[in-house]
Amino acid sequence: MSTVGTGKLTRAQRRAAARKNKRNTRVVQPVIVEPIASGQGKAIKAWTGYSVSKWTASCAAAEAKVTSAITISLPNELSSERNKQLKVGRVLLWLGLLPSVSGTVKSCVTETQTTAAASFQVALAVADNSKDVVAAMYPEAFKGITLEQLTADLTIYLYSSAALTEGDVIVHLEVEHVRPTFDDSFTPVY
């Protein structure tokens, strides 16, 4: 016995029903990035309305057991006056080390200190290769400051237990900031 209205749905009706139910049939896989030290790393997405700018600073030659300071400079695309006023979110600092580097290498981002050796006492997070933590994440420390204040008031400090030659250590700085608005017209000077 058949009942009324149990006919087969057409393709258009099935698609309309699927749209109405909004069932997500896709399986979303997390993006796995190659870990910096050991274990599995997972990419952290930027907040909505934010983007992440990445730049590197090559370390100059450094003596053993001496803390050196590296100034933070903005990439060219963020150095306009309007982009310097963008608010900062989270900051990530990580170290790229050549295999020839031996001994402990530490790095941190803090407010500019009068003595470089005091920087690690006030740092909220330290990237340290001897502890397999070659990255330091600052989720709340610099939140709300502008990119201009980031470059003017903050400094990267690097300590090595062994002497370093130029290019042995590359410091990677990744800053999450409000997404910039780029100009879509030329300056009217003609």
Curated annotation (Swiss-Prot):
It comes from the Viruses. Residues 1-24 are annotated as: Disordered. Residues 11-24 have a biased composition (Basic residues). Its main location: virion. The modification N-acetylserine is found at S2. InterPro entries: Bromo_CP (IPR002009). Keywords: Acetylation, Capsid protein, Ribonucleoprotein, RNA-binding, T=3 icosahedral capsid protein, Viral nucleoprotein, Virion. One of its GO terms (cellular component) is T=3 icosahedral viral capsid. GO terms for molecular function: RNA binding; structural molecule activity. Pfam families: Bromo_coat. It is found in: Virion. Belongs to the bromovirus capsid protein family. The N-terminal arginine-rich stretch does not seem to be the major RNA-binding region that allows formation of an infectious ribonucleoprotein complex. Capsid protein. Probably binds RNA and plays a role in packaging. This is Capsid protein. It comes from Cowpea chlorotic mottle virus (CCMV).
